[in-house]
């Protein structure tokens, strides 16, 4: 049997090169996963708004072109606070509306603390299948709300239930709809500029 010369054997790849390649691949995969996670947030929000998935309501700039239908449903209003020193409640707990009828209701919110605070409302509709038909024309939930210490504000919600709701067989037994809001804190307001010569209370004694 002929003897294999050492020079004929395959040489192992340099370990340093292999480690660098593996590290590069791992870094690329991690970056891809992080990027995908950030992209998923706006995509999920867009998907919910477009389809009404998870009870997300729709947005319209005007009333429906068709006349309201004879069929009516009861719309209940729910309010919640998470992490804010606010009192938040609907001025009406329930209204009966015709399908396609534009309705305006009000929520009242009061900042019970001694400082300005900012919040924004998240919302959904139940049953979840109604989300794609529950349409808002105007809502305080579209923007952040900043309340001064002790301030009370009345905030309107203008909405209608799309007439297509009645054509969907899944809604044949739906008689009650609940619109729910939860206010969450957004950020601390920036400190007010001090007048000339006014001591800065945020600093300790020097």
UniProtKB/Swiss-Prot annotation:
Q: Which GO terms describe its biological process?
A: respiratory chain complex IV assembly
Q: Which UniProt keywords apply?
A: Cell inner membrane, Cell membrane, Copper, Membrane, Signal-anchor, Transmembrane, Transmembrane helix
Where in or outside the cell it occurs: the entry states: Cell inner membrane
Question: Where do the coiled-coil regions begin and end?
Answer: none
Q: Which Gene3D superfamilies match?
A: Ctag/Cox11
Stretches in topological domain Periplasmic? 41-206
Keyword Ribonucleoprotein part of the UniProt annotation: no
Kindly give the SUPFAM superfamilies that the UniProt entry links to this protein.
Ctag/Cox11
The protein's matches in InterPro entries, at most eight in alphabetical order, are given as:
CtaG/Cox11_dom_sf, Cyt_c_oxidase_assmbl_CtaG
Q: Which domain of life is it from?
A: Bacteria
Cysteine-cysteine disulfides: none
Q: Name one GO molecular function term.
A: copper ion binding
The way this protein sits in the membrane is described as: Single-pass type II membrane protein
List the GO terms this entry assigns under cellular component, sorted alphabetically.
plasma membrane
Annotated membrane-spanning segments are 18-40
Where are the Cytoplasmic topological domains?
A: 1-17
Keyword Membrane recorded? yes
| PANTHER family, alphabetized | CYTOCHROME C OXIDASE ASSEMBLY PROTEIN COX11, MITOCHONDRIAL-RELATED, CYTOCHROME C OXIDASE ASSEMBLY PROTEIN COX11-RELATED
The family this protein is said to belong to: Belongs to the COX11/CtaG family.
What does the record give as the function of this protein? Exerts its effect at some terminal stage of cytochrome c oxidase synthesis, probably by being involved in the insertion of the copper B into subunit I.
Know the name of this protein? Answer: Cytochrome c oxidase assembly protein CtaG
From which organism does this entry originate? Answer: Rhodopseudomonas palustris (strain BisB5)
